[in-house]
Curated annotation (Swiss-Prot):
It comes from Corynebacterium jeikeium (strain K411). GO terms for molecular function: large ribosomal subunit rRNA binding; structural constituent of ribosome. Forms part of the ribosomal stalk which helps the ribosome interact with GTP-bound translation factors. GO terms for cellular component: cytosolic large ribosomal subunit. This is Large ribosomal subunit protein uL11. The lineage of its organism: Bacteria, Bacillati, Actinomycetota, Actinomycetes, Mycobacteriales.
Amino acid sequence: MAKKKVTGLIKLQIQAGQATPAPPVGPALGAHGVNIVEFTKAYNAATEAQRGNIVPVEITVYEDRSFDFKLKTPPAAKLLLKAAGIQKGSGVPHTDKVGSVTWDQCKEIATTKKEDLNANDIEAGAAIIAGTARSMGITVKDAPQK
């Protein structure tokens, strides 16, 4: 069987289990001629267990208007906000600290995001997460010194 020709790649961040044909999902998929209802049903079924999180999805659209999608891990920023128990990061992160996480929480988040991080091991992944935390005004406790 010949490979299908790819006509589009759509990246979206949608609440898990709550995709609807309303914007932003409908217009993004409609522009590529994808069956929106079919996608929303498939996405909601695939993300049902992760309700409450935002789950990024990469949708590959083919020439015959069929599609497949790959789920990513939730954004590091959202996982950090949940771990710190806060609503949003700081507007001026290097002056106002809005919360704190421990190094172990950074390692836990790095383990969750392992396949999407560009790191060789969990320690390096945790360092990436810690950097994200600092840029959001979240203090990292017990972090190893460089």
